[in-house]
Amino acid sequence: MADEMTADFEKRYNGGPSIHGVLRLPVGKPHVLVLFGPSGSGKTTILRCLAGLERPTRGRIAFAGQTWFDAEAGVQTSPQARAIGYLFQDYALFPHLTVAGNITFALRGIGAEACARRARELLDLLHLQGLEDRRPAQLSGGQQQRVALARVLARSPRLLLLDEPLSALDAPTREQVRGELRGLLRGQGIPTVCVTHDWVEALALADEVAVLGGGRVLQVGPPDEVFSRPADADVAAIVGVETVVAGKIVERVDDLAALDVGGVRLWAVDAHGQGGECYLCIRAEDVTLEIGTRPSSSARNHLAGRVTEVRPAGPVSRVAVACGFTLTALVTRQAAQDLALKPGTPVTATVKASAIHLIPR
C-alpha cells in the first residue's frame, strides 16, 4: 500500500543463522516501531536490510508504494535513494569536525544559505546552541547523541532507523534523553524503526513493539499488550515476565478459571474461555508479600510460602518465594528491610486474578 512500509524478507548466512523480518509500518505520520529482543536475535540485521546496507537473501521490502528490494525481480534500491536517516549505536560522529561541521556534512550539495539556515534550525531543535564550535570529544554523551540526531534529521528523511540510540549513555543521562527523544520523534512526524534490548526504553518510545527471538518476529502489538500479555512462553521469557509456570484449567466460573499448578489452586481471568493445559505468566510487580499466613487483601489468590532468595536490584529487591512453585515478587529495598525478608521467612504472596495471564500450551 502507498501509505505504509511492508517488509517480508529473509537473510541467510552461510553456516550461520537465518533472520526473518516481517514488519508493517504506517508512513506519513509519527509512529515508532521498536524491535525488541536479546542480543543475537536479529534486530540490527533487520535494520540494516531496511536501510539497504545488507541485501536480504529472499523476499521483498516496499515503502510508500516504492519497491526497495525484491529478490525475484532483482530490485535493490541504494541506501541513498531510500532517503533514510540511520543513527548508529556509536553515533559515528567525525572527531575532527565541529558540531556545526558534523551537521552540515549531511547537507553537502545544497546552497550555502540554505545549508546555514537548516543547520541553525537543527541546532535550535536539538538544544545545541552555543556548542557549534566544539568537537565531539568536548561534548557529553547526551550532547553527542543530539548532534548525531541533528545530522540524521538534516535531510528530512522519509524513515528513521535508530540502532540502540541510548545504549552509549550513562543511566541518569539515558533517563533524561529518553523523554527528549520521544518528544522529538513525535514532533518530527517521521515513521521510525528503533532497535533496543531495554524494556524501559521500549515502553517509553514505542507505539508498537515487535518482539524478536531466534531470528524471527514472535509478536507485534502495542507495548502494554506485548509486555503484559505475551503470546507464548518464548515471548514471556524475552520481555522479562519473571514467573512462567505450567498449569491446567480444572474449573470455570463465569470469566474466571481455576487452575492447578503442581497441586496449588489459583484463579485467573480467562475471558477467552480457553481450556486444558496452559502457561501462567505473572509479573513480579503484580505480587504482594505479607509476613505470616493471614492475608489482609481481598484478592483471590493467597499463597503461603517461604522466601528462598532476596536479590537486590538497584532501588528494588527481587524476592523468590517457594509456594508449591517458585514465584518472584518485586519489592522496594526499604520494604524488604521493614519486613525483614530473608531466606526462610514465612510469607503470604497475593496475586489478583486479573494479573495472571494464560497462554495455551
State the predicted function of each range:
Residues 33-34, 76-78, 82-92, 193:
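ABC nucleotide-binding domain signature
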Residues 83, 96-234:
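ABC ATPase nucleotide-binding domains
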Residues 59-71:
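Conserved ABC transporter NBD signature motif
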Residues 2-6, 10-29, 72-76, 111, ...:
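A short, flexible loop at the N-terminus of ABC-type nucleotide-binding domains that lies
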Residues 44-47, 147:
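ABC ATPase nucleotide-binding domain helices that frame the ATP-binding cleft
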Residues 36-38:
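The feature captures the beta-strand-to-loop junction immediately N-terminal to the Walker
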Residues 228, 263-318, 330-361:
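Glycine/charge-rich catalytic "coupling/switch" loops of P-loop NTPases
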Residues 51:
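Helix-to-loop junction immediately C-terminal to a conserved catalytic motif
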